[in-house]
Amino acid sequence: MKNLQVKLKVISILLFLLVLSQVLLSETRGIENGKRYDRLVIRDVIVINGNGTPPRGPLDVIVEGNRIQSIRRASLERDAYEKEEHVLDGKGKYLLPGLINIHGHIHDSRANQSLPFEYLYKLWLGCGITSVRDVGSNYDKTIEERRKSQEGLVDAPRIFLYMRAWGRSPEEVRRNVQEVKKRGADGIKVFGMDRDILKAALDEAHKLSLRAAHHVGVEEIDAWDDAEFGITSIEHWYGIPDAALHGSQNFPHWYNYSNEDDRFRYAGHLWREADPEKLKKVLKRLVEKGVAWCPTFVIYEANRDLLRAMNQPWFKEYLHPAIEEYFNPNPAYHGSYHWNWSTTDEIFWRENYKIWMAAVREFSKMGGIVGVGEDAGYIYMLYGLSLIRELELHQEAGFHPIDVIKHATGNNARILGMEDKLGRIRPGYLADLLLVGDNPLENFKFLYPDGVQDLKEGKIISRGGIEWTIKDGIVYHAPTLLKDVRKIVSLAREKQQLKE
């Protein structure tokens, strides 16, 4: 009996040591915020790729420097990575390609108040965004910020800079596009152009291997012209329903496009005026010509539900006072037009969304490339957080969550011309990744900083929140980044109170 008790104790100790060794070996170790390592192991993780395929795993993903070196079945051997110095424990977690924000603005001020780049960058990284296509900012500053990001001198996403092309004649716009190329831009953004000037701008861009994004205003050009002249992507939705009209939109006689209250109110009437059969032809033509569509559903959401937009829960901790001031209705600020916004306006916009979302879905079914962007810093939308909301809106539009992830990763990489380097978890690709504790395919809200509240065994628990964001092999602890953002906001509010 005594020998049996001794044996049982020995067995218990051995089992304890075995379990302890497994726990120790699976723990995250040797990881510091903001560091890149010669070799990093992300162990025992479920991979959601950016190519539209379902989750796979558990897998071990090996990163060397800034590249994904290998992906293999998770090792079941206890000591497989015993000698590894830098390990992220992925057990029960999900690894995705870093999110790409295809429509961003790197603002350095709002409402005539300075806005630190650090605030934007850490919000983006904290929300899993590892690349941003900037389509409008202070270009001299942004070129320098891009250099710092490339060299790892600042904690920031990758920056792809699309500078505005302009000109009062075809000759002038060609010279401007050439200058944009010389300054090192990755592409051009065009808007507010007559047809002959747009044609010249895009022709010159093609000669110089520059991609182009188009914010189509209410102009003489529309999506037919974008297809003919070879635009890379249409931003928002302008120009697409316009191309399916028979003549002009039914504007009232007193309408003034320069009055943004008029502009956005009657934009909410446009989709219902588009001829459905003609619209299908427009979409088909865009697909045939390889034009991508970046709908940015999120930036107009205030138009269909203003009170929701004004009272987003993260404003409490993450809304910088400069942006808060900018969001207040003010005709001097672009996008701050919600004065006397009515229930009727919201009803029109809700119908607008239904038709618009159906069109994006039809475009995708035809083979069109749909991208994900946020356009934050305007109309009550915060950087990073609004991109996660955009994922939810793509799901609302009828896309499967797997396809939504593809929109924000693989598709966006294609729009950038970086599909051989970004947007997928694949050996040889750049190590832009995010690790989250719960499955975003179950609920995109798991990607928000605070995750979601759930019920387990009669108790309310928190689930979700991105744990780690990896950009160019540099490992960032997302909660630490977001803590820094909260501190920036708190200090800015204190400074503002002292002024008052």
Where in this protein do the model-derived segments appear?
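Bacterial N-terminal signal peptides that target proteins for export
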Residues: K2-S12
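Bacterial N-terminal signal peptides
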Residues: S12-V23
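Divalent-metal coordination cores built from histidine and acidic residues
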Residues: R29, R36, D89-G104, P116-V218, ...
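Histidine-rich, glycine-flanked metal-binding segment
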Residues: R29-D38, V47, N51-L96
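C-terminal helical cap
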Residues: V45, H338-F348, Y353, M366-I369, ...
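Divalent metal-coordination and catalytic microenvironments
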Residues: V45, V61, N66, G92, ...
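Active-site neighborhoods of metal-dependent hydrolases
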Residues: N176-K182, D186, A244-A397, V489-E500
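C-terminal cap of metal-dependent C-N hydrolases
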Residues: L430-R486
